[in-house]
Amino acid sequence: MARIAGVDLPRDKRIEVSLTYIFGIGRSSSRKILTDAGINPDTRVKDLTEEEVSKLREIIEKEYHVEGDLRRQVNMDIKRLMDLGCYRGIRHRRGLPVRGQNTKTNARTRKGPKRTAGGKKK
């Protein structure tokens, strides 16, 4: 089983699809990596040689932010917005949608389950 960037790639899938299991690599970047490495995208992971795996590992480490580094970067960017106190940061802090979506009826994913206010007494 090939291990790249701390992720075990599934053996029976095509290498083009397997690379997308790494956080930060999608289909298009996967194709670009394989082109740079000179590997056929239809090759299965189990059929890769150790040379090809090391070449992939080298390209990914050199040119891409993936896994832990990328997650840390994203979290730091969100924290920076919150510290600045800008509109987007405030929306993140309150757990509301950040990109201008309506919140009157929808946005349940972001807001969480409904919290009903206490009943009104006479």
Swiss-Prot record:
Stretches for region Disordered: 93-122
Which molecular-function annotation in GO is an example for this chain? rRNA binding
Q: Which Gene3D superfamilies match?
A: 1.10.8.50, 30s ribosomal protein s13, domain 2
Q: Where are the transmembrane segments?
A: none
What's one GO BP annotation on this UniProt entry?
translation
In what ranges is there compositional bias, type Basic residues? 107-122
Looking at the UniProt record for this protein, which Gene Ontology cellular component terms does it annotate, in alphabetical order?
cytosol; small ribosomal subunit
Sorted alphabetically, the keyword list is: Ribonucleoprotein, Ribosomal protein, RNA-binding, rRNA-binding, tRNA-binding
* InterPro entries membership: Rbsml_uS13_C, Ribosomal_uS13, Ribosomal_uS13-like_H2TH, Ribosomal_uS13_bac-type, Ribosomal_uS13_CS
Task: Report the Pfam families cross-referenced here.
Answer: Ribosomal_S13 (PF00416)
Q: Which PANTHER family match?
A: 30S RIBOSOMAL PROTEIN S13/40S RIBOSOMAL PROTEIN S18 (PTHR10871), SMALL RIBOSOMAL SUBUNIT PROTEIN US13M (PTHR10871:SF1)
Q: How does it assemble?
A: Part of the 30S ribosomal subunit. Forms a loose heterodimer with protein S19. Forms two bridges to the 50S subunit in the 70S ribosome.
Concerning its family, UniProt says: Belongs to the universal ribosomal protein uS13 family.
Record function comment: Located at the top of the head of the 30S subunit, it contacts several helices of the 16S rRNA. In the 70S ribosome it contacts the 23S rRNA (bridge B1a) and protein L5 of the 50S subunit (bridge B1b), connecting the 2 subunits; these bridges are implicated in subunit movement. Contacts the tRNAs in the A and P-sites.
Recorded protein name is: Small ribosomal subunit protein uS13
Protein source organism? Syntrophomonas wolfei subsp. wolfei (strain DSM 2245B / Goettingen)
Source taxonomy: Bacteria, Bacillati, Bacillota, Clostridia, Eubacteriales
Protein's gene: rpsM
